[in-house]
């Protein structure tokens, strides 16, 4: 049975705008992602928009000054965005525009087999070994923090650290930090929610400019 693309936009409790594209399951892989990005490009109040990438790989909207972060899995594409910040160079890290998003299927059991590779000993103690949901939240948190920090090649176990996990059943956030190349500890807030059988996690710094006051 053929399905249509579904476009959904909302603002999270931490003030990050989210755009989700799902559906059209008769297509898959890179072709699905390409069509989903086309749907994103066409759904804007300000006209057609194009996702491009800096040399670092970080995404941006051509001709716009809003930080974005992009992730996809299966039949879901997620684009997170912040308010316009024309005073900030989006090609490099700035705490005002620190943003990362990651999405993963809520049933992906493979994360249980590789948790030792990306979780520190302290993190392994707070993430139950047999809890798929907790491990997916931990994995998406690490990925979102990596995207927010804009530090290529950073070690996930030693320099991206989770203090606690967000709660999917409430608006409860969690805390984490990233150690930059100068040894500075950058504090982050994590927020996770579930949509269409997927877990989405956002990471922003304590100084990130958002669309509204955080709860």
Task: Pin down the residues of each PLM region.
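Core catalytic alpha/beta fold that binds nucleotide/phospho-ligands
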Residues: 1-215
């Amino acid at each position: 049975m053929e399905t249509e693309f579904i476009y959904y936009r909302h603002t999270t409790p931490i003030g990050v705008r989210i755009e989700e594209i799902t559906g059209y399951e008769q297509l898959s892989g890179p072709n699905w992602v390409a069509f989903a990005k086309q749907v994103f490009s066409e759904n804007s109040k300000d006209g057609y928009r194009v996702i491009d990438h800096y040399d670092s790989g970080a995404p941006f909207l051509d001709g716009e000054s809003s930080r974005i972060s992009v992730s996809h899995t299966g039949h879901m594409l997620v684009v997170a965005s912040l308010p316009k910040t024309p005073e900030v160079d989006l090609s490099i890290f700035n705490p005002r525009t620190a943003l990362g998003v990651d999405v993963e299927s809520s049933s992906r059991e493979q994360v249980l087999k590789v948790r030792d590779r990306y979780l520190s000993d302290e993190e392994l103690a707070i993430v139950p070994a047999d809890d798929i949901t907790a491990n997916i939240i931990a994995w998406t948190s690490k990925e979102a923090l990596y995207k927010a920090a804009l530090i290529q090649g950073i070690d996930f176990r030693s320099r991206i650290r989770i203090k606690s996990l967000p709660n999917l059943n409430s608006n409860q956030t969690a805390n984490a930090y990233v150690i930059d190349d100068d040894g500075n500890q950058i504090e982050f807030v994590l927020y996770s929610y579930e949509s269409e059988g997927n877990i989405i996690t956002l990471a922003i710094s304590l100084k990130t400019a958002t669309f509204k006051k955080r709860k």
